[in-house]
Amino acid sequence: LPILEMLQPEIQSVQCLILVPSRELGLQIEQVWKKMGTDYKVNVCYGGHSIDTEIKNLSNPPAVLIGTPGRIVDHIERGTFRVDKIQTLILDEFDKSLQLGFHEQMSFIIGKLTKLNKRVLVSATSDIEIPRYTRVVNPTILDFIPENEAETNLSMKMVVSKGKDKIGSLFNLICSLKSQSAIVFCNHRDAAERISDSLNEKGIYATYYHGGMDQDERERALIQFRNGSVSYLITTDLAARGLDIPEMNHVIHYHLPSKEDEFTHRNGRTARMTASGTAYIIAHESEKKMDYIDYGMEVFKVENATSLPKQPEFKTI
């Protein structure tokens, strides 16, 4: 809404640039913008999408342009849109973009915005040297972390797997929870597919989601999960943030991420605001222990499943 107030209808050029680390986040922001019912045009640009189509769309300049850093650099170098009227730059999921190696592209873009009124809004979840990356001197920091981080509605429980292959433990956990849906996080694309296939063979309706899928496949998987056609989304950290996914009562860590930040984002899919949720960690004694995990947490014992969870209702997608 503050961005809306700053836009000027008489300026027929891009006035606000939003950089995002992924096309999914960009498309989500575009959808939210359109739901606001504003007359201001918005476009989204990202790698893997037809650049010719994007160039055609940008010939009638939007007031708000959303894009991944690499694709925005490409358009700037081609001179597809003017940068001299951009007054607001938003770096959404700024820390994620840095983790993905977009530092050089973001520096290039910021360097081109010479007439920027220094309205730089940064979204980050880790301790980042904001002035170093954004060229902003003495920025105003808005900290939304609760004063007492211990006051959380998230509980964590450990499921000890007897075997290195944790499929059996995951299956029994799902059946024990009797939950109609959950997100299962793993660390590798092939693992997401393997786990999904194994669960389906056991009668659990699941689908996988990862960065190796093309855009149509990924969107189809999300639609299936959102509308309840499948109950379990088996995914990499790609779904840990930046996606419009309903809040879950449970998230399950089949693998633990190497970084605590990603663990935090995964858990952010549950226990939002005043809601309660539980994160389950499936662990085997042979696995590397992570410094950020309290291995003395409550152990959740699962028995061999005797019945399957309620099957989802099939819907048209």
Give the location of each predicted region:
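Conserved helicase RecA-like core
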Residues: 1-317
